[in-house]
């Protein structure tokens, strides 16, 4: 949150996890009742005052196959961290490589606690719910009324201890690093200034060493030239 002291909430994290799961499962969801199908396709469409009463058809075998794919949890954790970024949650440590990456914390939390069977069950709860499909760029849909499919996933997740542990862990991680960012803002500036001065000092030392080296070489060459001249004078 870039220096903000506000607390990220459990509810926000739950919504982000639900949204991420829903997005990961889009390929397993199709529409029922083609007569009432509402879809927005193409670019630049503006749709106002939409009332939707549609049902979802859920391909359970697709869901089962999808959640068991090797990269599913990785993709899900990437989706969640990206959604956190989109919500302006600070996912940086002020360029300080010495602090543990909270993105790694979030990924490990998901891998340990958010089991694929739980995800499959919560997605299966969507069967019969409503959905609005919008595809393309620059589309605007306003005043749309529909049942919240993602809320069904949220309610399912809140009924599982594993999911609660995941959500709590992610929320604590975000708040921990946001607190670090806020608490250490001026420390970071001081460290940056100190680093600049250190770099200047290092550069100054290098320049001095180069100058000393040139002087030493000049003195050495000058001494050899003087010795040769003295030898020539002695011979003459």
From Swiss-Prot:
It is a single-pass type II membrane protein. The chain crosses the membrane at residues 200-220. A lipid is attached at residue 2 (N-myristoyl glycine). Essential for viral fusion with host endosomal membrane and core release. Interacts with A151R. Belongs to the asfivirus E248R family. This is Inner membrane protein pE248R. The lineage of its organism: Viruses, Varidnaviria, Bamfordvirae, Nucleocytoviricota, Pokkesviricetes.
């Amino acid at each position: 949150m870039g220096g903000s002291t506000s607390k990220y909430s459990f509810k926000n994290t739950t919504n982000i996890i639900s949204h991420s799961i829903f997005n990961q499962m889009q390929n397993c969801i199709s529409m029922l009742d083609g007569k009432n199908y509402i879809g927005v396709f193409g670019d630049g469409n503006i749709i106002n005052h939409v009332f939707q009463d549609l049902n979802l058809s859920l391909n359970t075998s697709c869901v089962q196959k999808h959640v068991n794919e090797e990269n599913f949890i990785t993709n899900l954790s990437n989706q969640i961290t990206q959604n956190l970024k989109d919500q302006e949650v600070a996912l940086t440590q002020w360029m300080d490589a010495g602090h543990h990456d909270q993105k790694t914390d979030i990924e490990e939390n998901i891998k340990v606690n958010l089991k694929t069977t739980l995800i499959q069950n919560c997605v299966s709860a969507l069967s019969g719910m409503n959905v609005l499909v919008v595809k393309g760029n620059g589309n605007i849909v306003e005043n749309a009324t529909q049942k919240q499919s993602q809320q069904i996933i949220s309610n399912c997740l809140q009924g599982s201890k594993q999911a609660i542990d995941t959500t709590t862990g992610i929320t604590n991680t975000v708040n921990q690093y946001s607190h670090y960012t806020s608490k250490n803002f001026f420390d970071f500036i001081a460290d940056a200034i100190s680093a600049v001065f250190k770099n200047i000092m290092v550069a100054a030392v290098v320049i001095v060493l180069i100058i000393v080296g040139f002087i030493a070489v000049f003195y050495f060459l000058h001494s050899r030239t003087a010795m040769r001249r003295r030898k020539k004078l002695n011979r003459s």
